[in-house]
Swiss-Prot record:
Induction: By heat shock. Its main location: cytoplasm. It is an enzyme of class 3 (hydrolase). PROSITE patterns: PROTEASOME_BETA_2. Coiled coil: none annotated. It catalyses: ATP-dependent cleavage of peptide bonds with broad specificity. This is ATP-dependent protease subunit HslV. Gene3D superfamilies: Glutamine Phosphoribosylpyrophosphate, subunit 1, domain 1. A double ring-shaped homohexamer of HslV is capped on each side by a ring-shaped HslU homohexamer. The assembly of the HslU/HslV complex is dependent on binding of ATP. Na(+) binds at residues 157, 160, 163.
Length: 176
């Protein structure tokens, strides 16, 4: 699996992910970019799960964003509907964390679109560790979203064998 974490604070939203790809219990690659920008750099997204499946979902999600003029929630709901009802898509195994200036969402293959409490997302095998670390930092420090995401990924990478210390980080800043 992997670890993807998203943190929102003080007008900034970050999605960060590690770079480890495994096949069974073997590390196949250590610098996979699991976080990317979509829809003219207005949306950021990260994935946990099968790499090929995730890239298929990124492509489908970007099409949904274009169909709905960048409206994140509508695009996410439409992707989740298709993912749940299409026989071929149902076989895809991945989770997506997506965010724009105003919303952060988790999209699952079960058709769920979840807006998490405190706009804190952590998915993948290291997700519970990253979530705990990020929550503690959000509640007890004045660190920015990027620093919190980096530290949360570092902690997850120290604990989870499927998470490494190669990070890809994308950030959006809300327009004033």
């Amino acid at each position: 699996m992997t670890t993807i974490v998203s943190v929102r604070r003080n007008g900034h939203v970050v999605i960060a992910g590690d770079g480890q790809a495994t096949l069974g219990n073997t590390v196949m690659k250590g610098n996979v970019k699991k976080v990317r920008r979509l829809y003219n750099d207005k949306v950021i997204a990260g994935f946990a799960g099968g790499t090929a499946d995730a890239f298929t979902l990124f492509e489908l999600f970007e099409r949904k964003l274009e169909m709905h003029q960048g409206h994140l929630v509508k695009a996410a709901v439409e992707l989740a509907k298709d993912w749940r009802t299409d026989r071929m898509l149902r076989k895809l195994e991945a989770l997506l964390a997506v965010a724009d200036e105003t919303a952060s969402l988790i999209i699952t293959g079960n058709g769920d679109v979840v807006q998490p409490e405190n706009d804190l997302i952590a998915i993948g095998s290291g997700g519970p560790y990253a979530r705990a670390a990020a929550r503690a930092l959000l509640e007890n420090t004045e660190l920015g979203a990027r620093e919190i995401a980096e530290k949360a990924l570092d902690i997850a990478g120290d604990i989870c064998i499927y998470t490494n210390h190669f990070h890809t980080i994308e950030e959006l800043t809300a327009k004033a």
